[in-house]
Amino acid sequence: MEFAHLTVLSLFCLAFVGITATSSGEDYWQSIWPNTPLPKTFSDLLIPSGITNSLPIKSEELKQYSTLFFEHDLHPGKNFNLGHTNSVGSIIRPFTKSRQGVTDSIWLANKEKQSLEDFCYSPTAIAEHKHCVSSLKSMIDQVISHFGSTKIKAISSNFAPYQDQYVVEDVKKVGDNAVMCHRLNFEKVVFNCHQVRDTTAYVVSLVASDGTKTKALTVCHHDTRGMNPELLYEALEVTPGTVPVCHFIGNKAAAWVPNHTADNLCVM
């Protein structure tokens, strides 16, 4: 199928979190994008202590990250069963050690085995830009500096809770080489923002088995030469460097891409 770029009329803005307390981070957001509510994905960055009482990504949500599939699977009518078909487990590292930095911020941490330092201070790949941020202002500054403009938009998923079976309703391409900001799975509120080259981001409209409609941020990697061959074969029965490989992005992350069609930022 032909993937169309998102237009202003086709943008679906997610429900935004209601923030009543004034914070410097939110004030800074409003100073750059007036009258644009802060997306729920970034609300943890306003917690005064910078620490949540539990891990932000629950075991049920891990399925959103662990299903790998082909780019040609992104078409209306395709069925996805999260955490079952083509799943490589709830905690995965699809790239080998030599390119570990490429995916440190994509795949979730096992708290008992990895630390924030493993994600934030590991070597980066060639042409990769990576920053860990613990404040909303820092994130805003990083993405604006990267794109050289405030005309950008943030896009995220809104997977329905306790739903694993979905049917694709529509697919929209939103951009290449997006900057991904992932909430790391620790109590301390830290987002890892990075750009991985040779990637394409999509918003996939899904319908759950109970009829609930949702949007899924999806990233396809076109350069898979560094992927772990055992995991890739287990999931898709292909070898690294042969075909693009895609995965969904869960609710605790967002993709920043240029906004060529609107004056104001719109968060999906």
UniProtKB/Swiss-Prot annotation:
Description of its domains: The BURP domain located at the C-terminus has not been identified in non-plant proteins.
Name of this chain's protein: Unknown seed protein USP
Primary subcellular site in the record, as a coarse category: Golgi
Residue stretches making up the BURP domain: 68-259
Extra remark beyond the main annotation: Most abundant mRNA species from cotyledons at early stages of development, but the encoded protein does not accumulate in cotyledons. The USP gene family consists of roughly 10 to 20 members.
Keywords: Golgi apparatus, Signal
Tissue expression: Expressed in seeds. Detected only in the embryo. In germinating seedlings, detected in roots, root caps, root hairs, vascular bundle, mesophyll cells and epidermal cells of the cotyledons and the hypocotyl.
Function: Associated with the protein storage vacuole formation.
Cellular component terms (Gene Ontology): Golgi stack
Leader sequence residues: 1-25
Record's subcellular location: Golgi apparatus, Golgi stack; Prevacuolar compartment
Source taxon at top rank: Eukaryota
Organism: Vicia faba
Coiled-coil features, chain-numbered ranges: none
Any matching Pfam family: BURP
